[in-house]
């Protein structure tokens, strides 16, 4: 049910820090901070049962003051389980169970309990009395290259009132506090692949140099003619600029310059006239 997590998000208080040290290893879960939910629905003829668990990796949950207190977990609950039931001929699920797990300002983490030996990650476990029953839950944050979000492992009625949530995420990997981890290499690329900018290569393309040479050549031509007109003829103002006859020669000068530059790069040795 989305209404439960929306209520917790509305009153969520950010933890002062989402960094934890377990067995002298540092972890930073801030990338997945904030209330998250996971749910499942099972058939319990003639009804249906829906279970939802809300948790925040960085802080405890706060009540929504706009909702009745008995319809939500108490303040500072670490994981809140909510059970709903859909009766025959009814359209909407009705809240039937409120199961708080843990209490405190933030989760208390231990080394990862699941997965192969050496797998990076964290675990948090809680057991609470619930009516005449006792509830237990394990939440495992498992180091992974891919974010998968929280998932319930024992979907069902809860064997012996035990629930387990596994969350595979890059945030659960050990944080050494130094340089960031290298990005995952794309298939078919070598470590030296990439463009000039990513490799720090300051070289420019020959087309850029050609453009710069042309601009400088035109500027020198105009300034040179202006100086000649001023020094030789005493012209001023607009008369300093090259005359119309000179301007008509500019395209041909540029064409010849481009031809020479291209010939230099291509190594062309062709001479003579071109066919008309």
Curated annotation (Swiss-Prot):
First and last residue of the signal peptide: 1-15
Instruction: Respond yes or no to whether keyword Membrane is given for this record.
Output: yes
Residue intervals annotated with topology Lumenal: 16-203
The UniProt keywords, alphabetically, are: Autophagy, Cytoplasmic vesicle, Disulfide bond, Golgi apparatus, Membrane, Mitochondrion, Protein transport, Signal, Transmembrane, Transmembrane helix, Transport
UniProt xrefs under SUPFAM superfamilies: Mannose 6-phosphate receptor domain (SSF50911)
From the Swiss-Prot or TrEMBL record, state where the protein is found: Cytoplasmic vesicle membrane; Golgi apparatus membrane; Mitochondrion membrane; Preautophagosomal structure membrane
Q: Could you tell me which residues belong to the region Disordered?
A: 174-198
Which ranges does the record mark as transmembrane?
Answer: 204-224
Could you tell me which InterPro entries the record lists for this protein? Autophagy-rel_prot_27 (IPR018939), Man6P_isomerase_rcpt-bd_dom_sf (IPR009011), MRH_dom (IPR044865)
| Any Pfam family hit | ATG27
Residues covered by the MRH domain: 16-175
PROSITE patterns documented for this protein:
MRH
- S-S bonds: 18-58, 73-80, 143-173
Assigned GO CC terms: cytoplasmic vesicle membrane; Golgi membrane; mitochondrial membrane; phagophore assembly site membrane
* Origin superkingdom: Eukaryota
The protein's topology relative to the membrane is: Single-pass type I membrane protein; Single-pass membrane protein
| Cytoplasmic side of membrane | 225-276
Q: Name one GO biological process term.
A: autophagy
Q: Which family does it belong to?
A: Belongs to the ATG27 family.
Q: What does this protein do?
A: Effector of VPS34 phosphatidylinositol 3-phosphate kinase signaling. Regulates the cytoplasm to vacuole transport (Cvt) vesicle formation. Plays a role in ATG protein retrieval from the pre-autophagosomal structure (PAS) and is especially required for autophagy-dependent cycling of ATG9.
Q: What is this protein called?
A: Autophagy-related protein 27
Q: Which organism is it from?
A: Yarrowia lipolytica (strain CLIB 122 / E 150) (Yeast)
């Amino acid at each position: 049910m989305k209404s439960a997590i929306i209520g917790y998000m509305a009153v969520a208080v950010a933890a002062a820090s989402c960094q934890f040290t377990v067995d002298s290893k540092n972890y930073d879960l801030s990338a997945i901070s904030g209330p998250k939910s996971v749910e499942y629905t099972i058939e319990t003829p003639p009804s249906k049962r829906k279970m939802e668990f809300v948790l925040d990796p960085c802080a405890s949950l706060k009540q929504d003051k706009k909702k009745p207190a008995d319809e939500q977990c108490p303040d500072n609950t670490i994981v809140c389980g909510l059970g709903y039931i859909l009766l025959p001929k009814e359209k909407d699920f009705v809240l039937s169970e409120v199961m708080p797990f843990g209490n405190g300002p933030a989760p208390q983490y231990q080394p990862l309990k699941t997965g192969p030996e050496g797998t990076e990650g964290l675990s948090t476990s809680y057991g609470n009395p619930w009516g005449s029953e006792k509830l237990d839950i394990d939440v495992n944050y498992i180091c992974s290259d891919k974010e998968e979000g929280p998932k319930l492992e024992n979907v069902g009625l809860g064997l012996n009132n035990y629930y387990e949530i596994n969350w595979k995420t890059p945030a659960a990997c050990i944080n050494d506090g130094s340089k960031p981890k290298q990005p995952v290499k794309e298939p078919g690329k070598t470590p030296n692949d990439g463009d000039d900018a990513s490799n720090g290569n300051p070289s420019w393309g020959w087309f850029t140099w050609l453009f710069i040479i042309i601009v400088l050549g035109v500027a020198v031509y105009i300034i040179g003619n202006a100086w000649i007109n001023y020094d030789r003829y005493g012209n001023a103002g607009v008369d300093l600029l090259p005359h119309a006859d000179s301007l008509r020669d500019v395209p041909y000068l540029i064409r010849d310059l481009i031809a020479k530059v291209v010939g230099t790069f291509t190594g062309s040795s062709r001479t003579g006239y071109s066919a008309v």
